[in-house]
């Protein structure tokens, strides 16, 4: 009987479970829709929709499997941390961290908050594997090579390189302005080149090295990848954050020493480029002549030799590691000329449209013959009425535009069609490299979040730290070299940290303090904190100077600089009815006592002067500016009285002698002490 009762209860229990699950189907669908938007869901949110006490474990596992197949991650609710500004940073098991918006347990509603939208979109980008990083790095390299190859076909590039070579020889510019010094030197070290040139060069480490110069070749290669803290001899943890600039200054070689080692090799490469391009220019002329004459005189062997020489020049230019600013200048020059050509093309097309020439027909007849001197004669001989109208009504305008195009062709040194092809190749390479860099940056944005949150409460807001870290990330993408073997995240970490710490040093304080002084302040603060624990009180400047082996005057100067500014609106007193600014003396304002003395002196002088003759009184008033806006010179007073300046001087001296008489002067001595 008991067994029968138990059997009777089983269907009811299953029915209850099925009913409970059926009632939650709408909530499950809503949960799946929200999770698809966010890309993840927490265990707590899953339990809120499907409580474990009412839903079986098998059903929960089925739902979790379904979520996994949809690409939705199920994460632990306890791992969600809320950071500054309301952003939530969810830490994963790897070295990177996933940033999401909102707080734990918050409903996943749509939002138009730009910060949350940024974090949501950032979290939707998949992380890159080592193979994915290499693939993108190769795409960046291929795009750059395509761009450089296009630049190497333009005579303007080699004109600029020749100018740079001459300026380097005459020392008008520095080597660091032409090439990427750290990348070139790092490549030389990897190939065991350039070390010979370093022998005998004593280059002091540059203190306060500029960020652009000191952030150098592969910082990750010189630093441990571990984030474990280091300890000093007393067992106290050493703050890496405060000492990063010190490490950079001590590990980076002097820029002058690098330039001295690389300059001979760079000049030699520039000479090779100039020599090879002289040959290439001759072959370009022959190739262009063969194309224009359509006689096929440029043989297959000559074309192969042309392509081989062109590839050699591209390799030489790539070895130089030209500075990005120089490459951008060359590209801007090409694009500027291309805009000029497009403007001329637009003018020609407008004239053709006005003459009712079919646009496609006109472009077919125009393109490729921009520099052909016989083009106008051939086109004007066409029997079509539209072409006749063009040259009857707009011949002078067409001639002017053709003349402008000829000037452009003479300047660029190649045929216009060839120049268009060069520009298209440069644009293609630039676009490919830019797209690959964008993908690399987007895939590592959450790495910036994970690093930036460790630097909060240091004077910059969290979003500002993210922004600065993103700038460092973009620089890391530009300088990353996958052939060195380390992962991009390891390499980018130090660039991001350096960008964030440098921005904190530059922007955190209301009054900017130089980076080298920030380092000294941090060192002083650390020592002061250590001595506070040792002696139980704040150390005196003398004790700090002795501990740091630093001059006392410098310690006092650093302590004075380290003081934070305070607001003039800071409340003063218990009732807080006054502000700090109310107690600051205005150096430009007249004190009430001085104002009273001046007014009394003015009244006394006014009573004394009438005892003189009217002429003497007026001369003194004009000479000393009494009762007037300004004083006057002897010449100006003489012109007023129509007498010489000598006569005015005599009248002034006589009047002053009269004022010294006791009958008049006894009223004035009391003002002499004021």
Curated annotation (Swiss-Prot):
Keyword Transcription regulation: yes
SUPFAM superfamilies: Sigma2 domain of RNA polymerase sigma factors (SSF88946), Sigma3 and sigma4 domains of RNA polymerase sigma factors (SSF88659)
Primary location: cytoplasm
Region annotation Sigma-70 factor domain-4: where it falls in the sequence: 608-661
Annotated stretches, region: Sigma-70 factor domain-3: 519-595
GO molecular function: DNA binding; sigma factor activity
Pfam family, one: Sigma70_r3
DNA-binding region coordinates: 634-653
InterPro entries named among the record's database cross-references: RNA_pol_sigma-70_dom, RNA_pol_sigma70, RNA_pol_sigma70_r1_2, RNA_pol_sigma70_r2, RNA_pol_sigma70_r3, RNA_pol_sigma70_r4, RNA_pol_sigma_70_non-ess, RNA_pol_sigma_70_r1_1
Top-level division of the source organism's lineage: Bacteria
Sequence segments annotated as region (Disordered): 216-252
Assembly: Interacts transiently with the RNA polymerase catalytic core.
Task performed by this protein: Sigma factors are initiation factors that promote the attachment of RNA polymerase to specific initiation sites and are then released. This sigma factor is the primary sigma factor during exponential growth.
Name of the molecule in the record: RNA polymerase sigma factor RpoD
Organism: Rhodobacter capsulatus
